Curated annotation (Swiss-Prot):
This is Basic phospholipase A2 Bs-N6. Binds 1 Ca(2+) ion. One of its GO terms (biological process) is phospholipid metabolic process. Disulfide bonds join C42-C131, C44-C60, C59-C111, C65-C138, C66-C104, C73-C97, C91-C102. InterPro entries: PLipase_A2 (IPR001211), PLipase_A2_Asp_AS (IPR033112), PLipase_A2_dom (IPR016090), PLipase_A2_dom_sf (IPR036444), PLipase_A2_His_AS (IPR033113). Contains 7 disulfide bonds. It is found in: Secreted. Expressed by the venom gland. The lineage of its organism: Eukaryota, Metazoa, Chordata, Craniata, Vertebrata. It is an enzyme of class 3 (hydrolase). Monomer. It comes from Bothriechis schlegelii (Eyelash palm pitviper).
Length: 138
């Protein structure tokens, strides 16, 4: 299932929001989001279930919840504007959807950066079937 997310990222093209999110992740972590965050733990990548495994996985859980709260928006494909200076990401002008999507992505990227010290390579490409705990509500 998470492999589909990676394929979706590659098919969206350079204008897609997922690639903008990947760029934000690179700014905050100096890591490429696709291998490091596209299939990490129980929540990073497509979908999510169970309990977040660590602080990085919780960043993804919160990001998923942020996207869920957006109505009449397409968070994985809408294009937004943002800038960065000295490691600070600033969401730019745009529609209410674009601004909210950008803010969801910005908060997640900052969260990833803040939790680099606890990132566990053993949670990369974590199999969904191991995420069996009851899921939290947003």
């Amino acid at each position: 299932m998470r492999t589909l997310w990676i394929v979706a990222v590659l098919l969206v093209g350079v204008e897609g929001n997922l690639l903008q999110f990947n760029k934000m992740i690179k700014i905050m972590t100096r890591k490429n989001g696709i291998p490091y965050y596209s299939s990490y733990g129980c929540y990073c990548g497509w979908g999510g279930q169970g309990q977040p495994l660590d602080a990085t996985d919780r960043c993804c859980f919160v990001h998923d919840c942020c996207y869920e709260k957006l109505t009449d928006c397409s968070p994985k494909t809408d294009i937004y504007s943002y800038s960065w200076k000295s490691g600070v990401i600033i969401c730019g002008e745009g529609t209410p959807c674009e601004k909210q999507i950008c803010e969801c992505d910005r908060v997640a990227a900052v969260c990833f950066g803040a939790n680099l010290g606890t990132y566990k390579k053993s949670y990369m490409f974590y199999p969904d079937f191991l995420c069996t705990e009851p899921s939290e509500k947003c």
